[in-house]
Amino acid sequence: MNYLTQTLVCTCALLTLGMFTAPSRAENTALPPWQTLEFEQKALWATAKSRIELVAAPQHPGQWLLSANSSVVSNSEEVHLRLLATSGQLVSRSRLSRGKNQRLKTYHYRPQYILRERRAPGPDPGQAAALWPLQSTKEVAYPDDLGAKVLTDAYALLLLAQRFGDTQTNSHQVAVHTDLNFYQVSLSRGQDTAIEVNYQLAGQGQVDGTRKARVIKLKVTALGQARDKADFRLLGLNGDIELLFDIESGLLLQLRGTAPRIGSSRISLKSATLREST
């Protein structure tokens, strides 16, 4: 693929918003009823926790800010996304990882390529991560097979799967960018099921009992040639994943999939904060 063709294809991918067929544009830009979700998974040797928050981008009309904090044992990550509200298309992304080493990676999604910047701590231990010395910059090419697919982040799949579930569409595909790799995620419908829940709803108390859930399946495959080891994760899960949404409230109640070193796993909603009415 020559440079001009690649530019046109990638520009098309950024501008064609990959909208689902049923919801209107106004519905696609409405924030979901929740503002924060917190999940937890307990294993014999560790407890994994994740917190997701979604708000409108105050200085960027038509865009959302998604923040995610996940931790297990001594490792943690802090992810910030700026997304197009209509599609979930990435505008910018950052990931601060802490563990044996610390590093901050930021990504700017341009029509021709992704600008990737990597920072690491300097001599000042109190320096903010955004001010850490720049270690490297890299232009990451979009894969030839991206086409007009929406390019998003794994955490944003929680939003897109909920939106997909509210349509009459039977299947949908998006692309996910990790660091150097790209993945195709195919969304489809599973059989509705009943699920036992036990979570805290801020300001309203404990919610427990049996809920009817809509099942959305995610099938993850490599998109283009792998440039690094496999690194797709969604709240610690990889491979094929199922998301279970409360049919009545729309809240994501549980994720089911495979976790490294653990095997088959279920990650359940532990608390939720609903958005204030405006």
Label every PLM stretch briefly.
Residues 89-145:
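Hydrophobic alpha-helical segments and helix pairs
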Residues 1-11:
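Bacterial N-terminal signal peptides that target proteins for export
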Residues 22-26:
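Sec/Tat signal peptide C-region and signal peptidase I cleavage site
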Residues 137-182:
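Extracytoplasmic beta-rich ectodomain segments of secreted or membrane-anchored proteins
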Residues 20-21, 31, 56, 131, ...:
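Selective for proline/serine-rich intrinsically disordered segments
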